[in-house]
């Protein structure tokens, strides 16, 4: 009976070792779970960005407001009867910001 108990104990020790330290053990399991959680967070951010881009595409295809906004902001276009004003910072402020950028 002692040899059987010793054999079963040796098998139990081997199984525990492989569970904790072996390939596909607890450490690998926790690492993979962390990787999956990080990937799911990344996927959620990308899905939100895709949804935003699809909404912008739909707005550009169907609505004139987004097209008008882009024309105003990027091309500085105005409607008939409107006056365009460009605000230019003071020369002293420009010199200060240029001096800070050179550092």
From Swiss-Prot:
Keyword Cell cycle: yes
Periplasmic face residues: 22-103
Entry's Gene Ontology cellular component terms: cell division site; cell septum; plasma membrane
Transmembrane portions of the chain: 4-21
HAMAP family: FtsB
Family: Belongs to the FtsB family.
UniProt name for this protein: Cell division protein FtsB
Gene symbol of the encoding locus: ftsB
């Amino acid at each position: 009976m002692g040899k059987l108990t010793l054999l079963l104990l040796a098998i139990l020790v081997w199984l525990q070792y492989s569970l904790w330290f072996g390939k596909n053990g607890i450490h690998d399991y926790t690492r993979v779970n962390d990787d999956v959680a990080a990937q799911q967070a990344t996927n959620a951010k990308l899905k939100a960005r895709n949804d935003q881009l699809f909404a912008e595409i739909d707005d550009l295809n169907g609505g004139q407001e987004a097209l008008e906004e882009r024309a105003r902001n990027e091309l500085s276009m105005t409607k008939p009867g409107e006056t365009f004003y460009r605000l230019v910072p003071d020369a002293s402020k420009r010199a200060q910001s240029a001096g800070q950028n050179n550092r």
